[in-house]
């Protein structure tokens, strides 16, 4: 497995807080941040907080799976970061390892930050296996442009506890700590201990939740497909279902 130093990790008041701190630490007025669409409603608002510009990326083939061509044709000299949430809120689409490998190589070569929101990465279906974006990095955590965000909210059903974290190089983590220090100081010590218990505890609860969600997906798809004129995208993970 991967090993990180404490100085390469920041713990925040939820994954949302971590995402916001990452954007505030990396972007400034006039920068552009690419976000594959449809996307979680908070991403563009976080980008706007620092005066940067959210740039929706719409796959030309009409699917929920962007191709590298969709990404690269939206890149300009102002592009500072790309946000990837896989599997995705709100579609449940999980991007292929090949696509993630391509986007890692692209971001490393162009010096663009790749913000990976892994909040749903263990809640995936049909035999899919979670993987770390760092397996595709050619550089160390200290040198790469990858930032990984996660939380206890979804995988451990700890939404109300507000505990999340981000992994990146020491310099950026220090900047994020400075920002967070003037926002919330830090997350509750109690919830931090509870999160440690969840992470180090028996992980069968995550698999049980995953199986429940996969069964729920089956029921949801059956119900939606029974309606005339309704098309539903079969999600690869999460607890969302995007119907048309």
Question: At which residue positions do the language-model features occur?
Answer:
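Active-site PLP attachment segment
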Residues: 136-175, 187
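Conserved glycine-rich beta-strand-loop-beta hairpin in the small C-terminal domain of fold type I
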Residues: 196, 211-221, 231-244
């Amino acid at each position: 497995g991967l090993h990180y130093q404490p100085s390469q990790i920041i713990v925040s008041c939820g994954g949302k807080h971590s995402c916001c701190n990452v954007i505030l630490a990396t972007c400034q007025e006039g920068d552009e941040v690419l976000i594959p669409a449809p996307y979680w409603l908070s991403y563009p608002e976080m980008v706007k907080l620092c005066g940067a510009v959210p740039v929706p990326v719409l796959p030309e083939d009409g699917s929920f799976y962007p191709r590298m061509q969709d990404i690269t044709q939206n890149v300009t000299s102002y592009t500072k970061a790309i946000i990837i949430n896989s599997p995705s809120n709100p579609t449940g689409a999980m991007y292929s390892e090949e696509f993630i490998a391509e986007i890692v190589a692209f971001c490393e070569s162009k010096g663009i930050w790749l913000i990976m929101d892994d909040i749903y990465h263990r809640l995936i279906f049909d035999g899919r296996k979670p993987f770390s974006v760092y397996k595709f990095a050619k550089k160390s955590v200290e040198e790469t442009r990858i930032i990984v965000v996660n939380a206890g909210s979804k995988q451990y059903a700890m939404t109300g506890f507000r505990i999340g974290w981000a992994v990146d190089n020491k310099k950026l983590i220090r900047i994020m700590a400075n920002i967070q220090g003037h926002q919330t100081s830090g997350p509750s010590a109690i919830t931090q201990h509870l999160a440690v218990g969840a992470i180090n505890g028996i992980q069968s609860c995550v698999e049980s939740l995953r199986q429940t969600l996969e069964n729920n997906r089956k029921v949801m798809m059956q119900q939606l497909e029974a309606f005339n004129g309704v098309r539903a995208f079969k999600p690869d993970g999460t607890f969302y279902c995007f119907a048309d």
